[in-house]
């Protein structure tokens, strides 16, 4: 298989970029070990990851890389006061399981989250990768899809479309189909759990007709299915750098109602690099076959970073085979970074950049107030309750899937953000305030 993800000229250019460190002011010398090692020496980085995540990432290799640069790495024990384990310049974490358990009123998890938040509140100088309110938004598909819809409306880029979606909060009744049609969805569509983390979050279904709705188990989110020639592009983001990995996805299906039985599948299994099944076997390429556009991916990644204040996340993107538009179908907090060979280097570079103040959190952008007003108005129009208790929140276009033949990856480097290129504080505050779930972490 070709090691290039994109067409030859584009791919070669990006492969060369993958071998180099991001060219940001102040970090060029760091790549040679001098300036960075001097600056990082004596810094302390704490981390909390599950044992499974530590093994999967081989995180001890990152700890060793840090130690070679003079950085002390501390594995945090949240059952003990974090204050006693400090001081800490940076904390890296994946508390998704703990947060979800805390939301279920698990006393031990509630205590862990409280202790973590208590330390954050007492030490605003400590950099958190990533903020808990943002993680809570990404754990909720309905909220993250609404965020994507708002970002799409803000960007006004015809190359981007956000799939129509609905949240179902109770069993579907007689009015559900009318509500689905009213909100712009059409068969077939994908049904997913609202919670975007854990084993169950990968269990999905393709619904082809009204009969298939009977098997839907709320609470869940339904999202329009967009044919994309069985290719999924996973974008793994680390600060201002990202890597695009091509994966298998679901094959094309005819638009409109059909007598097909619903298809139940595990998206994790379908989109594995080595996946091969009838669900991913493409009969033929239909319509257009567009490759991801670097500028589009860069702008989507930047908008998400600035709206949520996140650094470690993944974006699942498909290309509509009728329009060539990029559709974001899922966002994941701190993914597995499979296929990202330079993850640890990118992470350390990002930590250095943040500590040096080279990654601006937010700056001024003229139209942020207009976006807040526009998105607020649309939000009001898009929430309605049916007599059956179904709650719908519609997205503005159509799309979703997972698939591909190659596990090749290509590294794409971001340029350093300029002072006037970020989303304004009011936009960031608006997104987080309206989309993040209530939690003790806020």
Task: Pin down the residues of each PLM region.
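A short, polar/charged loop-to-alpha-helix boundary motif
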Residues: 253-260, 337-346
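A short, well-structured beta->alpha microelement
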Residues: 66-86
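Conserved metal-phosphate-binding beta-hairpin within the catalytic cores
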Residues: 290-294, 301-341, 410-411, 436-438
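Active-site flanking residues adjacent to catalytic metal/cofactor-binding acidic residues
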Residues: 93, 191, 223, 315, ...
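Short secondary-structure junctions
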Residues: 69-71, 155-161, 307-311
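Active-site nucleotide/adenylate-binding loops and adjacent lid/helix of ATP-dependent enzymes
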Residues: 2-56, 60, 85-88, 95-99, ...
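Anion (oxyanion) recognition and catalysis
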Residues: 67, 120-122, 306
């Amino acid at each position: 298989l070709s090691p290039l993800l994109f067409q030859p000229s584009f791919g070669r250019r990006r492969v060369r970029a993958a071998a180099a460190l991001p060219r940001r002011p102040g970090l060029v010398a760091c790549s040679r070990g001098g300036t960075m090692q001097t600056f990082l020496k004596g810094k302390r980085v704490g981390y909390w990851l599950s044992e499974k995540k530590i093994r999967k990432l081989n995180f001890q290799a990152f700890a060793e890389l840090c130690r070679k640069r003079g950085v002390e790495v501390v594995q945090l024990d949240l059952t003990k006061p974090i204050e006693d384990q400090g001081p800490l310049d940076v904390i890296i974490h994946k508390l998704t399981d703990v947060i979800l358990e805390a939301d279920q009123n698990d006393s031990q998890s509630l205590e862990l989250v409280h202790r973590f938040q208590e330390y954050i509140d007492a030490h605003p100088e400590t950099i958190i990768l990533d903020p808990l309110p943002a993680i809570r938004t990404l754990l909720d598909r309905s909220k993250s899809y609404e965020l994507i819809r708002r970002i799409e409306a803000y960007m006004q880029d015809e190359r981007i479309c956000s799939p129509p979606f609905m949240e179902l909060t109770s069993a579907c009744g007689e009015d559900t189909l009318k509500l689905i049609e009213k909100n712009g969805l059409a068969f077939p569509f994908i049904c997913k759990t609202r919670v975007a983390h854990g084993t169950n979050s990968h269990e999905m279904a393709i619904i082809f007709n009204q009969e298939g709705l009977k098997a839907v188990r709320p609470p869940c989110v339904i999202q329009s299915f967009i044919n994309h020639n069985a290719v999924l592009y996973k974008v793994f983001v680390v600060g201002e750098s990202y890597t695009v990995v091509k994966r298998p996805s679901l094959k094309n299906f005819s638009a409109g109602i059909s007598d097909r039985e619903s298809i139940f599948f595990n998206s994790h299994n379908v989109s594995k690099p080595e996946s091969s099944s009838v669900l991913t076997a493409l009969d033929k390429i239909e319509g257009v076959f567009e490759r991801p556009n670097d500028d589009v991916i860069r702008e989507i990644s930047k908008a998400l970073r600035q709206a949520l204040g996140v650094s470690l996340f993944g974006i699942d993107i498909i290309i509509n085979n009728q329009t060539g538009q990029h559709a974001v179908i899922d966002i994941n907090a701190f993914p597995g970074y499979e296929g990202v060979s330079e993850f640890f280097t990118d992470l350390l570079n990002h930590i250095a950049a943040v500590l040096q103040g080279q990654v601006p959190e937010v700056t001024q952008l003229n139209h942020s107030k207009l976006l807040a007003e526009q998105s607020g108005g649309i939000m009001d129009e898009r929430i309605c309750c049916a007599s059956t208790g179904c709650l719908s929140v519609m997205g503005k276009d159509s799309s979703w899937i997972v698939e591909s033949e190659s596990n090749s990856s290509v590294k794409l480097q971001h340029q350093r953000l300029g002072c006037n290129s970020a989303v304004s504080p009011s936009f960031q505050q608006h997104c987080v305030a309206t989309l993040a779930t209530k939690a003790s972490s806020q």
